[in-house]
């Protein structure tokens, strides 16, 4: 019998899995939901996402009923405000949202940049730290928040709707911009006051492996699961992957996908203005993270725009060739790799080509994208070293199915060993052992 029913909820789909430790016994087909992009906005309909969760679980069939607990791994931030009945007053606003630049500036200016970093562990990055989103709604849609009884991230929403509990974990709390991330000792009165909100509408923070609550009868009927089934509080998807990688101090975990996320595990967090610092979610460990917001998505954007007649296999072959060969002699084209903005900056940069001439070819443009991305990947290592945690030389790598990880690690200085891990988020959930509060 599977011990855990795992739910991996990303920015476009939900996968449910039956887990026995780190073994995946079965997985559902992906249940997709739509993220609405409008300018700098990125929103998900909460009811549509909840329906996708139910679809994924039911995709496992009768076996899903024979588990001991449910465990969650979610995208983050995914901010939402709820009323007294647990109904959403706002859309779920995801980490891809960039509408709140002005609000981010205001939060940092009022409290001071150094003070915010020292309290929260991060600067108030638009969308990446959800206090900026909360500030935007307070200013632009105050009516939506007048009846707010609970405000949190996706795991809080799921618990409120499925178990009736009001909980979150330290990894999610870290990215609210309101939590004492570096000490893990609760919500910060100073940060809440800076935003102008009350701690009363915030969830209780407990470790990710703590049972947040049991499924209500209504939720059990909707999901096809037993009423009362324990649901763990859950954690961020990247934390689940780090657990599978070992979560040892100095461990690097690199998720190479549409976004490229490089995380360092530490027991002594040292905030840096160009890094995201957050709790692991269990125990007293933290992750310090550097992110390229558009990695594979930048390459496949180039395929759609410049090489629409090429097959995927031909395109990937050319990526490898260009990576080995480098730019042609005399080529002056350069690429700034910010097609999806920058996760660790308040002022949002944009992607750009420079050095174009009448001799520039589409191959030059693709080569420039590769060079810009590989350089940006390598430039993250000095930032992580600056935290004072010694980096282990074996890097756990997830999401490298297209072998883009080899491309992205090309310019890393020194000797490294790369250890592929598959299904990292789902398998990491299987390592959480349920415990009572």
Predicted regions and their residues:
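Active-site core segments that coordinate phosphate-bearing ligands/cofactors
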Residues: 5-6, 15-18, 101, 108-124, ...
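A generic structural motif
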Residues: 30-32, 95, 293
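Short glycine/proline- and charge-enriched loop/turn segments
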Residues: 32-36, 172, 279-280
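Structured loop/turn residues at beta-strand edges in well-structured enzyme cores
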Residues: 65, 200, 389
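Short, glycine/charge-rich flexible loops or terminal/linker lids adjacent to PRPP-binding catalytic cores
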Residues: 97, 213-218
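Short beta-strand-loop/turn "lid" adjacent to the catalytic site in phosphate-handling enzymes
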Residues: 62-95, 120-128, 159-180, 204-208, ...
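A conserved helix-loop-beta module that forms one wall/lid of the active-site cleft
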Residues: 195-207
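N-terminal glycine/serine-rich phosphate-binding loop of ATP-dependent small-molecule kinases
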Residues: 1-91, 102, 220-221, 225-233, ...
């Amino acid at each position: 019998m599977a011990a855990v029913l795992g739910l991996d909820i990303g920015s476009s789909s939900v996968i449910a899995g039956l887990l026995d430790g780190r073994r995946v016994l079965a997985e559902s087909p992906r249940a997709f939901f739509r993220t609405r992009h409008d300018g700098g906005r990125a929103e998900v309909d909460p009811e549509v996402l909840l329906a996708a969760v139910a679809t994924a679980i039911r995709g496992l069939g009768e076996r899903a009923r024979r588990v001991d607990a449910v465990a969650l791994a979610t995208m983050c931030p995914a901010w939402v405000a709820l009323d007294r009945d647990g109904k959403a007053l706002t859309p779920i606003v995801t980490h891809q949202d960039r509408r709140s630049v002005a609000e981010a500036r205001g939060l940092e200016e009022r409290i001071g940049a150094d003070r915010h970093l020292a309290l929260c562990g991060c600067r108030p990055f638009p969308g990446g730290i959800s206090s900026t989103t909360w500030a935007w709604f307070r200013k632009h849609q105050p009516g939506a928040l007048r009846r707010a009884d609970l405000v949190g991230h996706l795991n809080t929403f799921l618990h409120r709707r499925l178990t009736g509990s009001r909980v979150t974990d330290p990894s999610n709390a870290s990215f609210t911009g309101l939590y004492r991330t570096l000490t893990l000792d609760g919500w910060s009165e100073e940060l809440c006051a800076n935003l102008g909100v009350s701690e009363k509408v915030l969830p209780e923070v407990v470790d990710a492996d703590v049972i947040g609550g049991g499924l209500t009868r209504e939720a059990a009927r909707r999901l096809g699961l037993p009423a009362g089934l324990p649901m763990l509080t859950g954690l961020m998807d990247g934390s689940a992957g780090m657990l599978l990688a070992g979560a040892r101090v100095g461990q690097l975990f690199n998720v190479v996908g549409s976004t490229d996320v490089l995380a360092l595990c530490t027991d002594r967090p040292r905030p840096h203005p160009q890094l995201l610092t957050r709790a692991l979610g269990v125990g007293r460990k933290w992750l310090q993270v550097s992110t390229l917001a558009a990695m594979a998505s930048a390459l496949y954007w180039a395929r759609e725009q410049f090489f629409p007649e090429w097959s995927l296999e031909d395109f990937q072959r050319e990526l490898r060739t260009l990576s080995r060969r480098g730019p042609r002699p005399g080529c002056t084209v350069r690429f700034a790799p910010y097609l999806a903005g920058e996760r660790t900056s308040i002022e949002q940069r944009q992607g750009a080509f420079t050095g174009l001439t009448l001799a520039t070819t589409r191959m030059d443009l693709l080569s420039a994208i590769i060079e810009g991305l590989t350089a940006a990947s390598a430039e993250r290592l000095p930032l992580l070293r600056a935290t004072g945690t010694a980096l282990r030389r074996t890097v756990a790598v997830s999401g490298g199915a297209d072998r883009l990880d080899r491309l992205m690690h090309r310019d890393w200085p020194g000797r490294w060993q790369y250890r592929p891990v598959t299904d990292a988020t789902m398998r990491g959930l299987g390592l959480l052992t349920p415990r009572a509060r």
